A protein has these predicted regions:
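Noncatalytic carbohydrate-binding groove/subsite architecture in carbohydrate-active enzymes
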Residues: 41, 107-112, 151-310
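Substrate-binding cleft and catalytic face of glycoside hydrolase catalytic domains
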Residues: 47-193, 230, 339-341
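A glycine-anchored, Pro-Gly-centered beta-turn/N-cap motif
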Residues: 444, 450, 455-459
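Bacterial N-terminal signal peptides
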Residues: 7-16
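Aromatic-rich peripheral "rim/lid" segments of glycoside hydrolase catalytic domains that contact
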Residues: 38, 66, 134, 138-139, ...
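Aromatic/hydrophobic beta-strand junction motif of beta-rich domains
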Residues: 407-415
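Boundary/entry segment of secreted carbohydrate-active catalytic domains
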Residues: 23-60
Length: 485
């Protein structure tokens, strides 16, 4: 018998307590530090003192050894230990190489068998994140095909669908968590570096692949997302412009998912006060901070970013716990990491410094969890899907009463997402006499010019904008125009 199973009868009772959580948001860390047998007790002590209840750990997949559980000896010890401590474990399973799936024929099927093996080996683990930031070339390649079209979303779809079916066959109660999306992407196939895909466009591609497949069952129970700031000195609620998204832009991700999957067998995010539907697993969040001189001996290398300071991080982390608890679609929030990595070229956003000393954020997060219990301290925020183009506006000519002569009239169109437009001028009988059509880039004014010799009479401008990623969402505008003799 597998030695992890020795503890099974005891763990079932412990897991029932962990898994039976209320609607309160769970707070935890994404960190593998505790998996090491020498670190486990200290690591779990810190989590317990913080009041955290969830730990995401990474489990690699090697297509060359698809039946070998990576780091199994350490996991065999850590899984029962963490569960007995009341910590809910989440396995984040991803290919070890960026081309680990796409370069190996049949790799998606091998991956599905691998996650099923993990589920059978560790039956107390009920949460599996499939992949990690597949919209980033560091973790998934290629992102684009030779013609510039996105291909990563379609390839990832095959992986996720296969993993979903394999895990549900082992245990239907397993939470299959999709994506682990990065908050940003450039959408530029010919970029000199970081050839990445924005989260909104990745979801669009994923939905296209799903619909084209004819699948009649879901592919995920939750959506993992990493709402990092654009810059470490950004405040919590600065966020991003479309098509990227951060903490204050979760509604943008919900809308993108609705656009991609509404009307299919894949549930979308709940609307209004409903709690039924897809949920977020915000499994990586962090603001990197500078290193205090007193702890510098524990680090090496050169800093590669412009970090914030410890005081700012402490406030942001506590505010994040409270703010995200007021979104009913958020199941858990995981800080990345608990303890800094000593190499300054890597990650220093922990609640604990590399020397083991605690940052101010340790105490502020501990207090926020204790005070709120993971529940909203104020009013819950409600989301509803939109049927309109985000930020759509039309600026009409300054004068809408003009003398008859050859005129050049200009409209200015704006939107906060990419859109297509059709603009026309109609006479009093409703007949279109002029037409223009084209595209509007997000946050950039599009000037639409009409040039003609107009006859005296009454006319109407009509403009319709359609969202580029969902033509069913549209915004329409009209304005009168009078041409005098």
């Amino acid at each position: 018998m597998h030695r992890a199973a020795v503890f099974l009868s005891v763990l079932v009772a412990a897991l029932a307590l962990v898994g039976g959580a209320s609607a309160a948001v769970r707070v935890g860390v994404a960190d593998d530090f505790g998996v090491d047998v020498l670190n486990g007790p200290w690591f779990l002590d810190q989590i317990g003192e913080l009041g955290m209840t969830e730990n995401r750990v990474s489990v690699g997949f090697d297509a060359a050894s698809p039946t070998t559980i990576q780091n199994q000896a350490a996991l065999d010890l850590y899984v029962p230990l963490a569960t007995l401590r009341g910590v809910r474990l989440v396995f984040s399973v991803a290919p070890a190489k960026a081309k680990g799936i796409t370069d190996t024929p049949g790799a998606a099927g091998l991956f599905a068998q691998y996650v099923a093996l993990l589920a059978r080996t560790y039956p107390t683990v009920k949460d599996f994140i499939i992949g990690n930031e597949p919209n980033q070339p560091r973790f998934w390649q290629p992102q684009f095909g030779r013609g510039g079209q996105n291909v990563s979303s379609g390839a990832y779809y095959e992986l996720l669908a296969a993993a979903y079916d394999a895990l549900k066959a082992v245990d239907p109660s397993i939470n299959v968590i999709g994506l682990g999306l990065s908050p940003r992407g450039g959408d530029k196939p010919n970029a000199p570096n970081n050839v990445s895909t924005s989260p909104v466009r990745f979801l669009h591609g994923l939905g296209k692949a799903y619909r084209a497949s004819g699948r009649s069952r879901p592919i995920m129970d939750e959506l993992a997302f990493h709402p990092y700031p654009d810059q470490d000195r950004d405040p919590l609620l600065k966020g991003y412009r479309w098509p990227n998204a951060g903490v204050p832009n979760l509604d943008r991700v919900k809308q993108a998912f609705w656009d991609a999957f509404y009307g299919t067998a894949q549930p979308v995010f709940p609307e209004g006060t409903s709690s039924n539907g897809l949920k977020f697993r915000l499994d990586e969040l962090g603001w990197q901070v500078d290193v205090l001189p007193s702890a510098a001996y524990a680090y090496f290398g050169l800093e590669t970013v412009s970090p914030t300071n410890e005081s700012a991080q402490a406030g942001i982390y506590a505010d994040a716990v409270r703010y995200l608890a007021c979104d009913a679609s958020v199941n858990s929030v995981l800080f990345f990491l608990l303890r800094d990595e000593p190499n300054l070229e890597r990650w220093q956003a922990g609640l604990v410094r590399a020397d083991g000393s605690r940052r101010p954020s340790f105490d502020t997060v501990k207090s926020a969890i204790a005070e709120s219990g993971g529940r909203c301290p104020g009013a819950m925020r409600a989301w509803r899907h939109s049927t309109r183009v985000a930020g759509a506006k039309v600026r009409w000519p300054r004068k809408l009463r003009l003398p008859a002569r050859r005129l050049a009239l200009a409209l200015v169109l704006n939107a906060e997402e990419d859109a297509r437009f059709e603009a026309g001028l109609y006479n009093a009988r409703g007949k279109r006499v002029l037409r223009q059509a084209g595209s509007v880039d997000a946050y950039r004014s599009r000037i639409v010019r009409f040039s003609s010799r107009f006859r005296p009479g009454r006319y109407t401008f009509r403009v319709t904008l359609k969202a580029a990623l969902n033509a069913g969402r549209r915004s329409s505008f009209s304005a009168p125009l009078r041409i005098t003799r």
